[in-house]
Amino acid sequence: MLPFLSMLVLLVQPLGNLGAEMKSLSQRSVPNTCTLVMCSPTENGLPGRDGRDGREGPRGEKGDPGLPGPMGLSGLQGPTGPVGPKGENGSAGEPGPKGERGLSGPPGLPGIPGPAGKEGPSGKQGNIGPQGKPGPKGEAGPKGEVGAPGMQGSTGAKGSTGPKGERGAPGVQGAPGNAGAAGPAGPAGPQGAPGSRGPPGLKGDRGVPGDRGIKGESGLPDSAALRQQMEALKGKLQRLEVAFSHYQKAALFPDGRSVGDKIFRTADSEKPFEDAQEMCKQAGGQLASPRSATENAAIQQLITAHNKAAFLSMTDVGTEGKFTYPTGEPLVYSNWAPGEPNNNGGAENCVEIFTNGQWNDKACGEQRLVICEF
């Protein structure tokens, strides 16, 4: 390396300096001159022998850094470092495919009851249920209003004479009694004014001859007036016989209530409307036809005692929605339940009365308690 650098130094020097040096060196008397003096380049001589290595020169300045060398081979993988802190959550990924249905879990605890719903509309009153078992005797309630007068009871045993009481209020007129035996003829009274001629009655059966009466005083010779009086008496007797016959037939029904001149009775039998109507007609009456709240209350007492609904006589067979009595008269009193009559199912043409006294339109083919009116 050193000889190469020496040649570079010599080549860099100017030729003039080189020649002067050579001249000065050539004038000196130095042994073995050939080894020290270089030939002039103009002389084209042979190259000299290699010189000795000179002393090492001073260390030069640090040169500029060279270009980076090629990347070396990867080193061996180092040991795994400690786990770093948890990073922030990444963005949600796309939903994966739906998995298979899992097994049913155990039933959950019952939820809290929701708020109470609105009150629904009133349902239609159902049929009367079977009579329940009698409950324990309750406490005595307040004294009720005076009820409708009951039927005349049978004559009781004669009691001992009590002290004279105060005069009571007039009682309800009782049913006409049986016709008594004919009494003796009384004295003839003064002749009254002639009355209007009544309609001739039906000829009655010939009666049993009575006892001969006491001879009366001589009356006025107006035979026409006497005949009129006799005809009037016959008419009254016939009406009494008809009324008595009705009471006899009504007595066949064991349970009843009396209101004014009406009697409502039942035999505790249940029939369809037409059969019930025929049953009352054969007994000389008709199905119950309440025309007032008092009569309706008397019928209610009967059906409450039997715990059954009963048919009334009114229908709307002639005109839908217009109920009439059997005579064709429109109603003068009614006590319909709320929302009635509604002709449910399009075939409710008869009327039934519930144990609460309210009315409902009902199919005539149903069976209901028979209550007759006399």
Swiss-Prot record:
Print the keywords alphabetically.
Answer: Calcium, Coiled coil, Collagen, Disulfide bond, Extracellular matrix, Gaseous exchange, Glycoprotein, Hydroxylation, Immunity, Innate immunity, Lectin, Repeat, S-nitrosylation, Secreted, Signal, Surface film
* Ranges annotated as biased composition (Basic and acidic residues): 49-64, 203-215
Q: What positions does the domain Collagen-like occupy? A: 45-221
| Coiled-coil portions | 222-253
Q: Where is the composition biased (Low complexity)?
A: 70-79, 137-149, 169-200
State its location(s).
Secreted, Extracellular space, Extracellular matrix; Secreted, Extracellular space, Surface film
**Post-translational modification, as annotated:** S-nitrosylation at Cys-34 and Cys-39 alters the quaternary structure which results in a pro-inflammatory chemoattractive signaling activity with macrophages.
Q: Which cysteines are joined by disulfide bonds?
A: C280-C372, C350-C364
Residue intervals of the C-type lectin domain = 259-374
Question: Annotated region Disordered: where?
Answer: 38-222
Q: Which GO terms describe its biological process?
A: innate immune response; lung alveolus development; respiratory gaseous exchange by respiratory system; surfactant homeostasis
Q: What is this protein called?
A: Pulmonary surfactant-associated protein D
- Please give the organism: Mus musculus (Mouse)
Q: Its gene?
A: Sftpd
